[in-house]
């Protein structure tokens, strides 16, 4: 990791927190065209994991994906445009806050449905393994996801 890691982490944490606080401020205006689920208080998980990943590594996330999207290098302007339902949004304004994606940054997507990105991540990781690529796939999910059948099925598949 780079020199001054603590300063880099702090700046990333601060930036993400400020963005989400601004979303909180703007949301009641009804200009944001999608429901939002914040990751305030959870920023450090995304920042820490993404700091250990390379630009070629990929992540999958949950509906609380703002921190992950930004920590992995997703474009802030594209993210905000997505929240506003604009064409220059990360998913052309069609997906909203809970379905952020930035393929160029390695942010493969988030989903509003609990645990659904887990099998996608496992399948992507298997493809990487079969192609003998030196890349990492990380998937983020909440504790509720571990109660879903797809979580257990994915863990069994990942063990192959």
Regions found by a protein language model. Give the residues of each.
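Cofactor-binding active-site loop characterized by glycine-rich and histidine/acidic residues
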Residues: 21-24, 29-160
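Charged, compositionally biased N-terminal leader segments and the immediate start
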Residues: 1-8
């Amino acid at each position: 990791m780079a020199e001054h890691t603590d300063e880099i982490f702090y700046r990333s944490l601060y930036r993400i927190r400020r963005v989400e606080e601004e979303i909180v401020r703007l949301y009641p205006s009804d200009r944001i065209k999608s429901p939002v689920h914040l990751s305030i208080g959870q920023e450090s998980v995304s920042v820490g994991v993404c700091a250990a990943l390379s630009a070629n590594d990929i992540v999958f996330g949950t509906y609380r994906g703002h921190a992950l999207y930004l920590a992995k290098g997703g474009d802030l302007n594209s993210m905000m445009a997505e929240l506003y339902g604009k064409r220059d949004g990360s998913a052309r304004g069609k997906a909203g806050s809970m379905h952020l994606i930035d393929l160029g940054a390695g942010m493969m997507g988030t989903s509003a449905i609990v645990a659904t990105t887990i099998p996608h991540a496992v399948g992507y990781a298997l493809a990487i393994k079969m192609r003998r690529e030196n890349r990492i796939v990380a998937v983020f999910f909440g504790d509720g996801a571990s109660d879903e059948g797809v979580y257990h099925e994915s863990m069994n598949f990942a063990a192959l």
